[in-house]
Amino acid sequence: MYLVAGGRGLAGCGHLSVSLLGLLLLLARSGTRALVCLPCDESKCEEPRSCPGSIVQGVCGCCYMCARQRNESCGGAYGLHGACDRGLRCVIRPPLNGDSITEYEVGVCEDEDWDDDQLIGFEPCNENLISGCNIINGKCECGTIRTCNNPFEFPRKDMCLSALKRIEEEKPDCSKARCEVRFSPRCPEDSILIEGYAPPGECCPLPSRCVCDPAGCLRKVCQPGYLNILVSKASGKPGECCDLYECKPVFSVDCSTVECPPVQQAVCPLDSYETQVRLTADGCCTLPARCECLSGLCGFPVCEVGSTPRIVSRGDGTPGKCCDVFECVNETKPACVFNSVEYYDGDMFRMDNCRFCRCQGGVSICFTAQCGELNCERYYVPEGECCPVCEDPIYPLNNPAGCYANGQIRAHGDRWREDDCTFCQCINGEPHCVATACGQSCMHPVKVPGECCPVCEEPTYITIDPPACGELSNCSLKEKDCVYGFKLDHNGCRTCQCKIREELCLGLKRACTLDCPFGFLTDVHNCELCQCRPRPKKCRPTMCDKFCPLGFLKNKHGCDICRCKKCPELPCSKICPLGFQQDSHGCLICKCREVPPSAGPPVLSGTCLSMDGHHHKNEESWHDGCRECYCHNGKEMCALITCPVPACGNPTIRSGQCCPSCTDDFVVQKPELSTPSICHAPGGEYFVEGETWNIDSCTQCTCHSGRVLCETEVCPPLLCQNPSRTQDSCCPQCTDDPPQPSTSHNESVPSYCRNDEGDIFLAAESWKPDACTSCVCVDSAISCYSESCPSVACERPVLRKGQCCPYCLEDTIPKKVVCHFSGKTYADEERWDIDSCTHCYCLQGQTLCSTVSCPPLPCAEPIKVEGSCCPMCPEMYVPEPTNVPIEKKNHRGEIDLEVPMWPTPSENDIIHLPRDMGHLQVDYRDNNRLHPGEDSSLDSIVSVVVPIIICLSIIIAFLLINQKKQWVPLLCWYRTPTKPSSLNNQLVSVDCKKGTRVQVDGPQRMLRIAEPDARFSGFYSMQKQNHLQADNFYQTV
């Protein structure tokens, strides 16, 4: 054995007698100072037999060996000569020359000199060979060991098998059972769900079912004057568990002479249920029942490993076709090919003696074996192996002897492989065995079957702490300035210098050990990568005198032909489902192809302006660093991420992070981020590719590539410290008054603010530097406010893009509670009328109905008015007026016809209108007449005079301001402000039609149309005196 730095091991297992003999000879001939033990593999240990005494563990602590007896050798280097039995000790005689005793001398086992008090209570164990069996992992494991106590439960194997058979009869083997996936049905209100369970002796559970709940049957109470009449008897089936009663008047229609047509019993498919019985208008006959789809029945199938679900037929929501029908099909995974052999995903193969590869997604990921260091003068590399092993020098002998090992005779000098890690050599009749020296440079090495040394698949730098580099100060270079990256110092930190191409290429190949016979692959900078080029196809040399700047075309075999390429390579990182567009020369460009009109419904081709200021084409996908985003009909739809709520009052979203955090929080919170064509929404519902829905009142989502992407309202800046949040608003709002500019400011000279990045903002303009911070320009100074987040009660709050505070999605997902009445479905809180006297209301699944009570009338002969519930006296009835069109002139002098809509008075209206409606007074209770108010003439005068006064004031103000060359508001519609450029001592203005206007100190003017920047959420004026000024930009005159 030899010293191996960092090695894991040799010996102690396997053919112990041969190995120990070889080890003794090796240690005797060489100056060994370390013992290398392999990882313990007890399956290769041989049970010591016919031991005269007890057994002890070997030198490596893995296998057992016979203990040394009296007068037998013991000890030696690392105890390779064995340990003495109980009651004996290993005695080493001192050297005759007077040298000191080392740890490598061989001793002899002798009786221990025990004192009488030491022998008290010492009783040697009487070890015997005991055979038996135990049940381990569902199998009978039998064996024979030498021990003092019997560790076996069954003395014979037949007894163990009988016990195992009894266990198997009581509990079936469900490892290979294939159970049908069944979804729990949605039970009607009169029944409860009984979950399925596996009966004794079976593996698959019974299907869940609905059973009638007697407690769900409620007794119906009728109003005075009505009787509770049984309409249909309960059948005992879910949906028909309760007797159906209806309230009918005491003096109802006589049904004795009515002959009802026969009603056939409806047989509903398994995915639907039969609705309740309905009556005709007279209440004598029953109408045919209908079938409606069960809610919550549709689900997504779960396929076994190696197969994926595929839609066979799509459901349309009708009984029998309520849900989509799926089937599980085998998925075809990409394979890797090496030496004409196919390897599938996860398979590992050997590329050469030192390189191993694993197939991952059709790509071979290769890595190199890790060999340890050898401290020996002579070594060799066994045939077919990568790592070398040590060998002893072979001296010439006259009559060398052979070796007998593993049933074979080996000649002097022969080498052979004992196992994956042990290599032996025959030297003069004795086998000398050594182990391969393995190195380890990673945390989790992978064991390759048939190989000794494990290999490292992960990079080794994970065990090295990254350098603590500070920010690069006093450097004007940006990321875009250094195409090949920044230069690094000796600590691995950036310097204010750009790399050149040669330095970048050298770094990519510096640690590469691959020997590629056909060269290396190159990247976009034409630098060689540590990846081998595939074997080139056998192509004839091209005899062509053409000069092709873009290269030659290739045929179907990949060989060059004498035709020039007309298009350059397309370096594009976009993901386009329908491919790329072509330019006028027929070459591909980095733009996604639009959907043809015949492929489906028309899709808007508008572009998306993301919150980071980039434009994206319709149906384009990208990743903004935190979320997957998608441009859908001009809207930026991004995935919801899960973020914890910050505990401080002024959180912020730092550069390079996705979730809000506190200033003293150094732990970076990473957001938690399928099968294509199916999306599983947070509310538990499934949606297909391209389907759009509202997850709450503020968030619209769409299904794209198996991901739920959502678009939310962009909230304006919050110019207060503690905004309030209401349920009817998607954005938090400020209840305090916004900051006002000082009155002493000279309004003749417009003020503006400039931030650290050089952006210019107009006076009273507000913006959001990030999702948690809002700023405003007041008196040429920037004031910023930080939004604080309230605590939430859910475990996984989500964060919308562009917003600061996470919130609980469970609180916003409405519960779809509906009411079923007379064969119709009504939403929660929906009202409807059965007739003029009966009004119903849906409240949390309960149908509540009210009947109008008619008051007594003083007249003798009341009349019945059509559309009214209660009769009325003739003197109280007012006929409905005729709607005669009235001619009115609008502000342009044109004649408009206006048809007045007069209300119909009724004593039975549930919702009473206010008594004062503009210049008309409505009083139903007094005389049921409409009277013009006394102020009608005054309102007419005001409506004419006030606009004239306002117009004159505006004209006079305009003339006065024009003389002083002041700033005046433009009467234009509000729009998102444009981002001004960085200016020096210039006055900035915004024109509603022409864009950004700049006035220099001189008479010259510059005009430029500015691109909108999504970071600036709009112009929010602070001037409360003029409402027109609050929504307008300013222009110099």
Swiss-Prot record:
It comes from the Eukaryota. The chain crosses the membrane at residues 941-961. Residues 469-498, 505-532, 539-564, 567-592 form the Antistasin-like domain. The modification Phosphothreonine is found at T1036. A motif (Cell attachment site) lies at residues 314-316. GO terms for biological process: negative regulation of BMP signaling pathway; negative regulation of osteoblast differentiation. Its main location: membrane. Keywords: Disulfide bond, Glycoprotein, Membrane, Phosphoprotein, Repeat, Signal, Transmembrane, Transmembrane helix. Coiled coil: none annotated. Glycans are attached at N330. Residues 1-34 form the signal peptide. The keyword Zinc does not apply. Residues 35-940 are extracellular. Pfam families: Antistasin, CRIM1_C, IGFBP, VWC. InterPro entries: Antistasin-like, CRIM1, CRIM1_C, Growth_fac_rcpt_cys_sf, Hirudin/antistatin, IGFBP-like, VWF_dom. GO terms for molecular function: PDZ domain binding; serine-type endopeptidase inhibitor activity. It is found in: Membrane. Disulfide bonds join C37-C60, C40-C62, C45-C63, C51-C66, C74-C90, C84-C109. Interacts with BMP4 and BMP7. May play a role in CNS development by interacting with growth factors implicated in motor neuron differentiation and survival. May play a role in capillary formation and maintenance during angiogenesis. Modulates BMP activity by affecting its processing and delivery to the cell surface. This is Cysteine-rich motor neuron 1 protein. The gene is Crim1.
